[in-house]
Amino acid sequence: VACGICHSFTADGRCVSLLKVLMTNYCVYDCQYCVNRRSHDTRRTAFTPRELAHLTISFYRRNYIEGLFLSSGVLRSPDYTCERMIETLSLLRREYHFNGYIHAKAIPGADPALITQLGLLADRLSCNIELPSQQSLSRLAPDKTKTSILKPMSQIRDQMCQSQYEVARYHGAAAFAPAGQSTQMIVGASPETDFQ
């Protein structure tokens, strides 16, 4: 199990052990930097939401992990993938009463309503900016656009701000990604300078 465990920090600064896992390594995209790209000849697999929820709660109950870091290749479409992630987190939170930490990757291109549902179930959301320019994105990740990546990042930021206001003001208000938002950028795969 150790190879699937990573560490992260909660909103209150605690370091937690997380099960870091993909919902699936199937992907409709052909990003040149990704081992799970459509054109790469690799063995494919996918969890069902129930399988992944059961695996997570089993590890949690044995004290192997304190939370989940859930990402995914894009299976069929961004919406379909996000729906499966939501179903997994919903099973964990509502059926298994999982109170551990959850970091989920928002899927660019998914319906904003699905991103909202994901953020209400997860402690932290992230959406990878991938590359510093549209030109590099077009060359290395031809199926993605800067807009499809920046749109959910902006939505997450705005909903976090609104949620912080509501939680401070109204008793029982639902928290949206209370531990924040993060992103990742690939450095060195494209010709941009640090300044750019």
Role assignments for model-derived ranges:
Residues 25-37:
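Local cysteine-cluster metal-coordination motifs and their immediate loop/turn environment
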Residues 64-69, 178-182:
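Glycine-rich, often proline-containing surface loops adjacent to acidic residues and nearby aromatics
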Residues 53, 58, 76-196:
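Conserved AdoMet/S-adenosylmethionine-binding subsite of the radical SAM
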Residues 1-24, 38-43, 96:
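N-terminal [4Fe-4S]-dependent radical SAM core
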Residues 38-68:
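Conserved alpha-helical substructure of the radical SAM core
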Residues 18, 31, 70, 127, ...:
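Conserved, mostly hydrophobic/aromatic
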Residues 23-28, 128-132:
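Short connector loops/turns at beta-strand edges and beta->alpha or beta->beta junctions
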